């Protein structure tokens, strides 16, 4: 998936969580957008990889793309880091939900992810798509609509 789809996936997931669980919607959406980019630190040409080129190059060299940073092990480590060092639960939850949305979206691609890293088994959802394809554009549109819906519901109440 492309960076914009990951960002919208993080925002959509976090606005839904804010709606259903009472989190702050603005903090959740912002941290979800950031969290949705974090797993791609392993890709030097990703949005986050270009912002942190040295870290990205190191992670990419050591692990490769869609391996460690796209795994449950990485999520567990990030959970301990965020819950220990980020006191605001809106932000820590948003980061984690954003990262989880990233893994789900990348598992929806042709190559899938190594969710059980260090195992070499790739996990891919049964219906999958090519990154940057028309199918991804439809997913992006759906995530955008979901985000708009939840933002509306959060700030204006019932829709119908």
Curated annotation (Swiss-Prot):
Swiss-Prot/TrEMBL keywords: Cell membrane, Membrane, Signal, Transmembrane, Transmembrane helix
Keyword Cell membrane attributed: yes
Residue ranges crossing the lipid bilayer per the database entry: 67-87, 137-157
Family matches, as InterPro entries: YdjM-like (IPR007404)
Primary site of residence: membrane
PANTHER family: INNER MEMBRANE PROTEIN YBCI-RELATED
Protein name in UniProt: Uncharacterized protein YvsG
Species, as recorded: Bacillus subtilis (strain 168)
Gene: yvsG
């Amino acid at each position: 998936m492309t960076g914009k789809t990951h960002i919208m996936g993080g925002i959509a997931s976090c606005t839904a969580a804010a709606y259903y669980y009472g989190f702050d919607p603005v903090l959740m959406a912002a941290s979800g957008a950031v969290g949705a980019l974090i797993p791609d630190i392993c890709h030097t040409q990703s949005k986050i990889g270009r912002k942190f080129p040295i870290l990205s190059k190191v992670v990419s060299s050591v692990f490769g793309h869609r391996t460690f940073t796209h795994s449950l092990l990485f999520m567990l480590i990030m959970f301990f880091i965020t819950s220990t060092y980020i006191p605001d639960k809106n932000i820590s939850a948003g980061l984690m939900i954003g990262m989880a949305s990233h893994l789900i979206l990348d598992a929806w691609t042709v190559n899938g992810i190594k969710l059980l890293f260090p195992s070499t088994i790739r996990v891919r959802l049964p219906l999958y798509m090519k990154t940057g394809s028309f199918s991804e554009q439809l997913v992006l549109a759906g995530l955008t609509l979901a985000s708009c819906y939840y933002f509306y519901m959060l700030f204006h109440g019932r829709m119908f």
